[in-house]
Design a protein with these regions (language model features):
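Catalytic cores of nucleotide-sugar-dependent glycosyltransferases that transfer UDP/GDP/TDP-activated
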Residues: 1-211
Length: 211
């Protein structure tokens, strides 16, 4: 970012560095220090320590008022992530989050309210309308069934019920545990008359690059 700005742009160009989540925090802090001409925005979709609190079966929102972010980071061995996120939130030009409930989380756990709340969601026209939607849906179903049948050696037809879940690998926070238990109950339902194809679109390995 710094090199591109120095060698490809001029002082008259307006540039904003948008950082999402704690993983990009160091980049935002570096740009803030090395290229102050670039505006910096940091957006958190949920605090790292908040995710950890919830993921460890602790009640996050019921007792949010009682949590101290720094203390909980130490207890849950989250000091590095929490520190990067907190310092980034406090030092960028503009700190944002995606909902009022997450903003409450930021106030309590990062000791910093968002400068702006940018509500999460999609525009109404995100989903195609009419025949365009029907065509896309039909092609998508056909592709998913084709892949599943080839992988599993099955012959599931077009009346198959397709369900799915996706997101980062947070087993409890993202409801993956609930999704799998629902499939388990469906699998034992003697009244179920059709095939059910379930997709779990979650990264399976994010620790390091694969060889």
């Amino acid at each position: 970012v710094e090199s591109f700005y120095r060698y490809n742009l001029t002082e008259n160009d307006k540039v904003v560095y948008q950082a999402h989540e704690w993983m990009t925090g160091l980049g935002a802090l570096y740009v803030q220090l090395a290229v102050p001409e670039i505006g910096t925005i940091f957006t958190t979709h949920a605090t790292s320590i908040g995710r950890s609190i919830a993921g460890n079966d602790k009640p996050l929102y019921d007792y949010l008022f009682a949590y101290n972010g720094d203390q909980m980071a130490q207890e849950l061995n989250m000091q590095s992530k929490h520190s990067i996120e907190k310092q980034t939130a406090h030092h960028v030009d503009c700190f944002t989050t995606v909902s009022e409930i997450t903003n409450n989380e930021c106030k309590e756990l990062l000791d910093k309210a968002a400068d702006v709340v940018l509500m999460n969601g999609f525009e109404d026209d995100f989903v195609p309308q009419g025949t365009a939607f029907t065509g896309k849906r039909k092609r998508a179903r056909s592709l998913m069934l084709n892949v599943a049948n080839k992988l599993l050696g099955t012959n599931m037809g077009d009346d198959t019920l397709i369900i799915g879940t996706s997101g980062r690998y947070e087993f409890k926070n993202k409801g993956i545990d609930v999704f799998l238990e629902s499939l388990n109950r469906l699998n034992r339902d003697k009244d179920l008359q059709k095939n059910v194809l379930a997709f779990v679109n979650v990264p399976g390995w994010v620790g390091e690059p694969r060889e």
